[in-house]
């Protein structure tokens, strides 16, 4: 179990690093969005390429941050129901959710997303808009983001099983450490 906990710490570190860089994608998306709006209104000029970069960055930030968001315990849960149960029961509900819902959903996205990306990459698929961009970078974000989410699900599963065995403290307790946004 110690080897699995070490793997869990490695996955947590990876998603924390990704979370730190995704913050910059959000800033870039916001900057490009602002420049697009000003240039379009002030000079009556628009670029499909810049509009597409804007939504590429927006999509990348949400997809790549999914694992980090799970690490921080910020994914939506039905706490109204689970808060009535004991901590062990809540942990078992999490274990059930990771195995029955999160893993199959991530695997389905990977199963269909990887060939989707591969076809776009091999064919050099382009946007149908004049001045549009190649599509494969944004298609790559789907399998990449869901891989990070699934890995974080594995990490959370390991931590919860270790808690149930009495090897670690409650992994769902909020820690006083800084998040990537605060650093």
Task: Report the location of each language-model feature.
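Alpha-helical transmembrane segments and membrane-interface helix-loop junctions
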Residues: 1-183
């Amino acid at each position: 179990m110690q080897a699995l906990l070490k793997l869990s710490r490695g996955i947590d570190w990876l998603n924390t690093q990704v979370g730190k860089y995704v913050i910059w994608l959000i800033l870039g998306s916001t900057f490009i969005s602002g420049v697009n709006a000003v240039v379009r209104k002030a000079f009556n000029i628009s670029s499909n390429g810049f509009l597409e970069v804007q939504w590429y960055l927006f999509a990348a930030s949400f997809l790549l941050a999914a694992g980090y968001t799970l690490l921080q315990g910020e994914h939506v849960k039905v706490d109204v129901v689970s808060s009535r149960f004991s901590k062990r029961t809540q942990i078992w509900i999490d274990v059930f959710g990771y195995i029955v819902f999160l893993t199959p959903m991530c695997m389905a996205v990977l199963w269909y997303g990887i060939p989707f990306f591969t076809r776009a990459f091999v064919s050099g698929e382009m946007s149908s808009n004049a001045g549009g961009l190649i599509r494969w970078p944004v298609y790559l974000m789907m399998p990449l983001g869901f891989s990070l989410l699934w890995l974080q699900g594995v990490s959370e599963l390991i931590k919860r099983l270790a808690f149930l065995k009495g090897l670690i403290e409650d992994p769902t307790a909020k820690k006083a450490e800084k998040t990537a946004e605060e650093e």
